[in-house]
Amino acid sequence: MQWETVIGLEVHVQLATKTKIFSGASTAFGAEPNTQACAIDLALPGTLPTPNAEAFRFATMFGLAVNAEIGKRSVFERKNYFYPDLPKGYQTTQLAEPIVGAGYVDLELEGGRTKRVRIHHAHLEEDAGKSLHEDFAGMSGIDLNRAGTPLIEVVTEPDMRSAEEAVAFAKKLHSIVTSLEICDGDMSQGSMRFDVNISVRPKGQEKFGTRTETKNLNSFKFMEEAIALEVERQIDVLEDGGKIIQETRLYNGDTKKARSMRSKEDSNDYRYFPCPDLLPVILDDDYIDAVRQQMPELPDARQARFIGQYALSSYDAGQLSADKLVAAFFEQTAQLSQDAKLSANWVLGELAAHLNKTEQRISNSTVTPELLAGLIARIKDGTLSSKIAKLVFEAICNGEGDADSIIDTRGLKQVSDTGALEKMIDEVIAKNPQQVDNYRNADDSKRPKMLGFFVGQVMKASQGQANPQALNELLLKKLNT
């Protein structure tokens, strides 16, 4: 039997406000436990929440960015459940009247395919605290610094049919919120967390299967692995005649295994009701229009501009525009070097590989746009071959200086002098008379491949510094006479 995977996501986006959603306590990451929790966060008697206006502005920006309806009237509700890191015994969130209504995000997938993922809604809520288990023998600690941090929870429709589509959506959402600067996007610090709802059904069946939820995935890689594992598990259970239990599961990225946490609750289990301490929030058209005017360039608009302004392919433009900092680095390099195509190739190729290898972000890279533009200039004027340019780039990464100083210090200037090249070519021809005869007696169709032998010999003699274009022209001239 052929099976179809059905995936929906719930994404928790931590908003980059300086203070919490209902209190003035700081949201800065990394402070000592319980040093950034005030009386409101601790749920002390007599305290009342005060909504954070910046959180509403950020949520409105997000809604506009995902083509959604903005809720002009939104209501906070209490989601009731007990957990040690939830001091109040309930979470203040939104359900019936969220700030962001139905919207959508368009994806570009491999092979030129496109996919529209519908967003059911997005709502504002407060984050819970954090339970600490590792540093306490036989006990657990509670850190309430995170309690009350503002979140947007984005809930999609079950529109995704593979791990590839789910990861593509997650990456697009990450690109949107970081471009808007409403979230720093640092998943290692919990700034974005993904809950994945997964079910399978026989291909062609309209009715959804029983879903499970895998919670708190904090990387694209873990999301892909967790989906593949859960899909395989569900198919095995069904093909063995079993039934899928609606449950919440937890994936361990170290062991590559998942386990059941608890049975999955429905909304009725949380006994939602309107929060009596908070009035409905009313947003008018003037407010929404003012927020729209403040919005920065979004990834899709940036991609379209890169295609038109720099004549880049849709793929290259998409890769460069996904990250706001990468896009800015590319544009500065392109303007300094006056060569957008070479700039794109180097940013997406050698620079991306270097950042990945050294686990650096482009914002603190040792390679600057000025240094990369200087290297590109030496490629354009023929000073460096593409092969030698990579050696110079490695030296730049190691902090040895700019391209010009490295070329001078190491003597890496490309050999374009006709006299010097002819001398090396003559020596190679003289040393290889049999290969010369074979080349001259060969069919035209075989000659290009045979020419590679002579190119390689001259490159070896020049230590890779011969100008490839000049070398090929001179070799053809000498071998064909």
Swiss-Prot record:
UniProt-listed InterPro entries: Asn/Gln-tRNA_amidoTrfase_suB/E (IPR017959), Asn/Gln-tRNA_Trfase_suB/E_cat (IPR006075), Asn/Gln_amidotransferase (IPR018027), Asn/Gln_tRNA_amidoTrase-B-like (IPR003789), GatB (IPR004413), GatB_C_1 (IPR042114), GatB_Yqey_C_2 (IPR023168), Gln-tRNA_amidoTrfase_suB_CS (IPR017958)
Catalytic activity, as annotated: L-glutamyl-tRNA(Gln) + L-glutamine + ATP + H2O = L-glutaminyl-tRNA(Gln) + L-glutamate + ADP + phosphate + H(+); L-aspartyl-tRNA(Asn) + L-glutamine + ATP + H2O = L-asparaginyl-tRNA(Asn) + L-glutamate + ADP + phosphate + 2 H(+)
GO biological processes: glutaminyl-tRNAGln biosynthesis via transamidation; translation
UniProt entry keywords in alphabetical sequence: ATP-binding, Ligase, Nucleotide-binding, Protein biosynthesis
Family: Belongs to the GatB/GatE family. GatB subfamily.
Subunit structure: Heterotrimer of A, B and C subunits.
Designated name of the protein: Aspartyl/glutamyl-tRNA(Asn/Gln) amidotransferase subunit B
Designated gene of the protein: gatB
